[in-house]
Amino acid sequence: MNLRFTKMHGLGNDFMVIDGIRQSLPETGLPLPADEIRRLADRKFGVGFDQMLIVQPAQGDADFRYRILNADGSEVSQCGNGARCFARFVREQGLTDKKSIRVETAAGQMTLSVTDDDQITVDMGAPRWAPDAIPMTAKAEADNYFLVSGTQAWDVGAVGLGNPHCTLLVENVDTAPVDTVGPLLESHEQFPERANVGFMQIVSRNEIRLRVYERGAGETLACGSGACAAVVIGQRRDWLDDTVTVHLPGGTLHVCYDGQGGIQMTGPASHVYDGAIEIAL
């Protein structure tokens, strides 16, 4: 099968975006076999991407269905940077001309809003603090948790945003142990579905620096849901105000949350190229 796709990125968090409305994909299980996704994600032998995004017809009253597949072939429920690229893709491809787009995800419905300066705001929904909603194993909901591995322990905040997130405070993100601590906490036994791990440096009450080790992808240049998680965790511990600028290795996002409704995350989405590749189904 000749598969048409568009390569996009949100602050360097890159995606292979596939129109599953105007071209046929398998109807059962994953939109593509996991081994085929891993091959396509390979940066030397495939297209190369952090996540694959699939545009599908909505099953309910939304405009589209939005599916996200990690580079390892696993499916996840949420990706903020991907959501911004999704909004730009469906408009550029002529699938809609709406500036407010409702999409179905495995975590529920979300709204994507395109501004006049082509920035895109994503309503990421309300944070979920209860351990079973993150999900993580803990006796009770808390502002922070101590995760132990061997002789080491880390003080983290944890929240569910469709995906499980934990965030720890560091003095300097440039020297943070992302490559070593990231995998340990991602697969920590208290996260039954694994977790995205954020390393947050606070610059001021309205500004942070952040690096994120994503489950199923490793460290990425940006993580929209990770930025939202870091902000609300910082707010919960009275470190941050309602509106926060988040500097990631790939660029800057703006996150707003006043404790009511959903977290609002704003940033760009970039179109890199269109292509086609032969795949075996």
From Swiss-Prot:
* Binding positions for substrate per the UniProt entry: 13, 51, 70, 80-81, 163, 196, 214-215, 224-225
Top EC group: isomerase
Show the GO MF annotations.
diaminopimelate epimerase activity
Give the chief site where it resides: cytoplasm
Its pathway is: Amino-acid biosynthesis; L-lysine biosynthesis via DAP pathway; DL-2,6-diaminopimelate from LL-2,6-diaminopimelate: step 1/1
Instruction: Keyword check for Nuclease, yes or no.
Output: no
Going by the entry's taxonomy, the superkingdom of the source organism is recorded as: Bacteria
Please give the InterPro entries that the UniProt record associates with this protein.
DAP_epimerase_AS, DAP_epimerase_DapF
Per UniProt, subcellular location reads as: Cytoplasm
Please give the catalytic activity noted in the UniProt record.
(2S,6S)-2,6-diaminopimelate = meso-2,6-diaminopimelate
Report one GO cellular component. cytosol
Keywords assigned by UniProt? Amino-acid biosynthesis, Cytoplasm, Isomerase, Lysine biosynthesis
Matching Gene3D superfamilies, A to Z? Diaminopimelate Epimerase, Chain A, domain 1 (3.10.310.10)
Q: Which Pfam families match?
A: DAP_epimerase
Instruction: Quote the EC number.
Output: 5.1.1.7
Which Gene Ontology BP terms does the record give? lysine biosynthetic process via diaminopimelate
Has UniProt tagged this entry with the keyword Cytoplasm?
Answer: yes
Q: Where is this site: Could be important to modulate the pK values of the two catalytic cysteine residues?
A: 165, 214
HAMAP family, per database record: DAP_epimerase
Relate the assembly described in the record: Homodimer.
NCBIfam families associated with the record: DapF
UniProt function note: Catalyzes the stereoinversion of LL-2,6-diaminopimelate (L,L-DAP) to meso-diaminopimelate (meso-DAP), a precursor of L-lysine and an essential component of the bacterial peptidoglycan.
PANTHER family noted in UniProt:
DIAMINOPIMELATE EPIMERASE, DIAMINOPIMELATE EPIMERASE, CHLOROPLASTIC
Q: Which family does it belong to?
A: Belongs to the diaminopimelate epimerase family.
- What is this protein identified as? Diaminopimelate epimerase
